[in-house]
């Protein structure tokens, strides 16, 4: 073999080795990033894994042994959930709001908060959406702002934990900023040209921001399509929302 040919082969081997090493590092980096994300929140990072994590909590820690989740006649899922770092420890808690008749009454439904080790942190009665992450912190825990029995209430953490009955917690002034949110939505590019019948929609994701409001609206062209806008009053940002659960 001549020297030039030997050099080309050696160069090719080096390039191949470099590429292989780069791919390994890239995959390792992705895996590390995913693990870091899970470590940061303490919960599974993928939606599917997180759904399974919550389903296990419901099956083992909310429902009694042998019970199964019933079908809701209205088509709603038996529960919904959201996550947030309530106590600023770098790990997310999970709020699960039950939606079937076993856990719901005329004023609202039962909600539960669990940590990432599946330990129950709090239980709430007479709770419904919107359920927002409050800005204020008491004893290291964020307030939870939730609807109950015709009004929004501020659930504040105390030496005894969060209060059980949402409806007896202090009233939270939700309407003042909601009026400002209506103006921002109506003046947005998404609504003012072809929108009509703007109304509040309360299917916000659990632990949405305290200053966030959701609206639905129709189109003036007679289309059956219903669209949604989320308004953050503090940032003045209006965002179209594609799907609502």
Located regions from the model:
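Bacterial N-terminal signal peptides that target proteins for export
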Residues: 5-19
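C-terminal motif of bacterial Sec signal peptides marking the signal peptidase cleavage site
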Residues: 27-29
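Acidic, small-residue rich beta-repeat scaffolds with periodic aromatic anchors
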Residues: 31-56, 133-245
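Repeat-based blade/solenoid architectures
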Residues: 66-79, 124-134
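Calcium-binding motifs, dominated by EF-hand helix-loop-helix domains
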Residues: 82-86
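Acidic/hydrophobic-patterned starts of short beta strands in beta-sheet-rich repeat architectures
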Residues: 88-99, 138-146
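Short, solvent-exposed loop/turn segments at conserved positions within beta-propeller repeat blades
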Residues: 104-109, 223
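Extracellular C-terminal loop/segment signatures of secreted glycoproteins
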Residues: 110-129, 164-167
